[in-house]
Amino acid sequence: MATKFPSFSQGLAQDPTTRRIWYGIATAHDFESHDGMTEERLYQKLFSTHFGHLAIIGLWVSGNLFHIAWQGNFEQWVADPLHVRPIAHAIWDPHFGQGAIDAFTQAGASSPVNIAYSGLYHWFYTIGMTTNAELYQGSIFMMILSAWALFAGWLHLQPKFRPSLAWFKNAESRLNHHLAVLFGFSSIAWTGHLVHVAIPESRGQHVGWDNFLSVMPHPAGLGPFFTGNWGVYAQNPDSMNQVFGSTEGSGTAILTFLGGFHPQTEALWLTDIAHHHLAIGCLFVIAGHMYRTNFGIGHSIKEILETHNPPKGTPGDLGAGHKGLYDTINNSLHFQLGLALASLGVVTSLVAQHMYAMPSYAFIAKDYTTSAALYTHHQYIAIALMCGAFAHGAIFFIRDYDPEANKDNVLARMLEHKEAIISHLSWVSLFLGFHTLGLYVHNDVVVAFGTPEKQILVEPVFAQFVQAASGKAIYGFDVLLSNAGGAAANANAAYMDGWMGAINGNTDVFLPIGPGDFLVHHAIALGLHTTTLILVKGALDARGSKLMPDKKDFGYSFPCDGPGRGGTCDISAWDAFYLAVFWALNTVGWLTFYWHWKHLAIWSGNVAQFNESSTYLMGWFRDYLWLNSSQLINGYNPFGSNNLAVWSWMFLFGHLVWATGFMFLISWRGYWQELIETIVWAHQRSPIANMMGWRDKPVALSIVQARVVGLAHFSVGYVLTYAAFLIASTSGKFG
């Protein structure tokens, strides 16, 4: 007899109800909980999944390259990136009539296609690709890489090739390898690609597999490198009137510090980018020699942490300091994952900021829809990663934290001071919430009663001061970099011309701000602090609280501990994650609304609309949401359809998915159990239907599972709705 799913849990496999299926899916990746799991086996399985992950990423990249080469218009776009719309892929089956077929036959295509808003065209062009053949080659290369990664994943599950537990626990060697080899070498290798391929292509000099060994990236060759005369590589940069992709105005420099943007492409100078990657690569290679391994040189992280104690009598004494942290972190995969997710979350948010403020890809700043899509995409990913970081932090406290091993160290002190931490976050959230909402509501009321001059408008003077210190002249502060003859400006003379031109020019670096920005900044701060409050409380209370001191014994996710201890519902660490996701989505909504509306106003040359309407609530509802929905909603109507029709449909569908979430969030398990029992009864008493039997007795989802289904619908619907709105409202205006 075939083994029932799930094979990793005999207890679940023998469950006679449909709980077997849903719990099996829910715990499939919780390797720690599987039957017969050892610590070594756990690490080995996780190690192999990393190769699977890499294979999926490689396959995805390969698919993008392949479809753009096959069905896109890359070569036409390269010839005129400002006027040709990039094609993502063909639409094979537009079965909605001739009107729609005509509407989606766009961007010079002869059949229906989708427009690309991914920025991939800009990236491929910037890094030196100009032909479909090169895209195909890249696609095949990534396919081979994926196959290799899959093989590596399989290989490391074979008995002979499974790394030992000691190998996984060797933190210093792993850090050195990741820093020097993965980060360091790959950064230097990327510099090599930019210098040898991308920069020559940007100057009209083709470099490919046919000639890369014979084309010198710099006329002086390697001579200056070996003689230490490195300044030669920065001489003769591209001129301010260089035409990207041609010899016109091109220089010979390969590593520069120009600052600012290429006037035609409005992207960072490629030679500046190459310099950046070389510098950061060298730093990482040095960092990768920092930790002591079997060579006996460098630092021992454990020694550093053990001795990291403040002198006795220091105010705010840290107790045992960082004692015990090395083993605590090194023995907890959840702690490590929490740190990794938090770091990646911050980096992803920074990527969102930098991709629009300091774009590195040629002409991407002129593709408004792509800029908006990429900003929004990266901020949404950032909130997901940050919520995950705290979730795994909480799991660490429940499964991995050892109070004895961490006696009186900084981790134990966090737990001891949790009341102070949580109550301060609560106070900040309340303060921000009441004051910000109070200002918005006041302004809304006075505008509604026809006296807009009675609004309370606060200039963000401190933020304006920071912008002025960075060189923005519009406010007249005359401080630091905006003080032309000052010491700060002189000290940074190397890149000052380019930077000052950028910050005071028509770019996205430090946009002018006013009272509307001040208010929405504090609304976003409210969202961030409230999300943080929920997440931090969930992690710090994960082991127990005054209400439920034995909470850790119930695990990460539990619905309640029955009616006998009234009030134990909704307090598991999982519930904190669940509640935080709603606030995180709320926050990223305000953040992306702000970014998008401010940019729509700038791009359309009507900054007054944002400045005047963003100071009261109805301004946001009417002049941002309602006004920008109109084109979208008319994507299809009784009179026909246009090329926004697909986004109109997605907008409606997103609302449907989102609203479905409430069905699971509002009704509890008993309702569904009764409904299921009634449906089973009806099946059993109906002809034909009664021929069908259930191998598993149908039962309702658990409370926690129903919540996760509700949360998934809410989140996915939220994302689909806003994505459709964002893309349609931007592309409908700017094409």
UniProtKB/Swiss-Prot annotation:
Catalyzed reactions per annotation: reduced [plastocyanin] + hnu + oxidized [2Fe-2S]-[ferredoxin] = oxidized [plastocyanin] + reduced [2Fe-2S]-[ferredoxin]
Amino acids binding phylloquinone: W672
Residues involved in [4Fe-4S] cluster binding: C560, C569
Statement: the UniProt record of this protein carries the keyword Zinc-finger: no
Membrane topology term: Multi-pass membrane protein
Gene3D superfamilies: Photosystem I PsaA/PsaB
Gene Ontology annotations of biological process type: photosynthesis
Name the UniProt record assigns to this protein: Photosystem I P700 chlorophyll a apoprotein A2
The encoding gene: psaB
